[in-house]
């Protein structure tokens, strides 16, 4: 199976690539969507900043992201990658990918920002990405923003950081994690395995 990681040109995606290859996937790094349909799945990694990442997706592909996801290829957005699914973000001025309704907001300044380190997740509903993942599992976060979906039903797990932070979202062929599964040990590996299984369907 061959997967694609989209490279915004913003930083190191080596750990994500290695984590996927350990699960038996062949991985290419791409910088536009024009050949993305050649892959069984796509990952939007969690490195970079909102505006430059959005521009890299919008400006270097003749195929729009919204048209690409209509193909039903599974897409996993990690941290920033998940945040870009929404319509706008307080981190930047660019419009988001808008494949999900809602916005991205800064964590309240009464909390330590960024939220960095291990925290557990509360599973709200079953989801293919969470098969074999026990409730209250610990995963690794590094983020300063949280998503506010217009439809709360897409949130399948959240995390308590003084406020509820959507930790896992799912809508159709789109999956998102606010945390980094590639840095979350055995639990993260299980989630990546689950994503690969969805890509095989």
Regions found by a protein language model. Give the residues of each.
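Pocket-forming structural segment of enzyme catalytic cores
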Residues: 88-163
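Short, surface-exposed beta-strand/loop micro-motifs that present aromatic residues
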Residues: 163-171
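Extreme N-terminal starter segment of soluble prokaryotic enzymes
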Residues: 1-4
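Acyltransferase
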Residues: 177-201
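Beta-strand-turn-beta hairpins that frame and shape the catalytic cleft
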Residues: 136, 170-174
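Short acidic low-complexity segments
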Residues: 27-38
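Cysteine-nucleophile active-site neighborhood
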Residues: 48-117
